[in-house]
């Protein structure tokens, strides 16, 4: 699980 692949879900949670 790379940060780049998990960035999309992480960004949504940060929004």
UniProtKB/Swiss-Prot annotation:
Tissue specificity annotation: Stored in spherulous cells in the sponge tissue.
Q: Relate the protein's function as given in its record.
A: Possesses D-galactose binding specificity.
Q: Which organism is it from?
A: Axinella polypoides
**GO MF entry, a single one:** carbohydrate binding
Subunit composition and interactions: Homodimer.
Q: Does the keyword Iron apply?
A: no
Lineage per the UniProt record: Eukaryota, Metazoa, Porifera, Demospongiae, Heteroscleromorpha
Keywords, ordered alphabetically: Lectin
The protein's name in its UniProt record? Lectin-3
């Amino acid at each position: 699980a790379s940060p780049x692949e998990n960035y999309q879900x992480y960004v949504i949670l940060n929004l």
